[in-house]
UniProtKB/Swiss-Prot annotation:
One of its GO terms (molecular function) is holo-citrate lyase synthase activity. It catalyses: apo-[citrate lyase ACP] + 2'-(5''-triphospho-alpha-D-ribosyl)-3'-dephospho-CoA = holo-[citrate lyase ACP] + diphosphate. Keywords: Nucleotidyltransferase, Transferase. This is Probable apo-citrate lyase phosphoribosyl-dephospho-CoA transferase. Transfers 2-(5''-triphosphoribosyl)-3'-dephosphocoenzyme-A on a serine residue to the apo-acyl carrier protein (gamma chain) of the citrate lyase to yield holo-acyl carrier protein. Signal peptide: none annotated. It comes from Streptococcus pyogenes serotype M18 (strain MGAS8232). Belongs to the CitX family. HAMAP family: CitX (MF_00398).
Length: 192
């Protein structure tokens, strides 16, 4: 397993990332105002370091998007947008499903899908005129765990407990295991 397989994209600068976050917040605000009766799902990947994109990361992203669409197959989807900037992949979806129900489905997906923990599946609502994510903990779900040490992810992030190198290695191992397991089950499906 080579880390370069997963982190082979174009490196970005901090200024690029800050601009992308600003644009994402404006896009989220626009969508919440344009679809006031719908629920907004905003999907990005948790990829540390200056390289946010690669063919394998895109493959993982698209697998999760497909899983989201499958999970919401019985619900009306009013709008979808998939963006592939070098600052990280983005996906937006508006559904008629109530926001809290949508968040519960996304928590289940993050938990059930082995690579779900690499994603931010944010369900956003307007709060004081700004997009605000619904917290997992307000719905009774535990905080997300760090994929390196299993402690609370936000605490590890805030304290910068793990190096970018450590996190990229852990992500590479997770993706390698996921893709190899997926290939093995595909092979056994064909022979079975």
């Amino acid at each position: 397993m080579c880390k370069d397989t997963y982190f082979s994209g174009e490196a970005i600068q901090l200024s690029d990332m800050l601009r992308a976050r600003e644009e994402r917040a404006l896009r989220q605000l626009h969508l919440l105002k344009e679809y006031p009766e719908g629920s907004l799902l905003s999907v990005t990947m948790n990829i540390p370091g200056p390289i946010k994109t690669s063919p394998k990361l895109l493959e993982a992203f698209d697998i999760v998007i497909k899983a989201i669409q499958t999970a919401l197959a019985d619900d009306k989807i009013c709008y979808q947008l998939r963006l592939l900037p070098t600052t990280g992949y983005e996906y937006y979806l508006i559904t008629s499903l109530p926001s809290q129900d949508l968040k519960l489905k996304m928590i289940a997906l993050e938990t059930d899908l082995p690579i779900g923990r690499l994603m931010d599946l944010d369900v956003l609502v307007l709060s004081n005129g700004r997009p605000s994510p619904i917290s997992r903990t307000t719905l009774g779900a535990p905080p997300r765990q760090c994929f390196i040490c299993s402690k609370e992810a936000k605490v590890c992030g805030r304290l910068r407990k793990h190096s970018v190198e450590e996190m990229q290695t852990a992500i590479s191992k997770l993706l390698h295991s996921f893709f190899n397991k997926d290939n093995q089950s595909s092979s056994s499906d064909k022979t079975g």
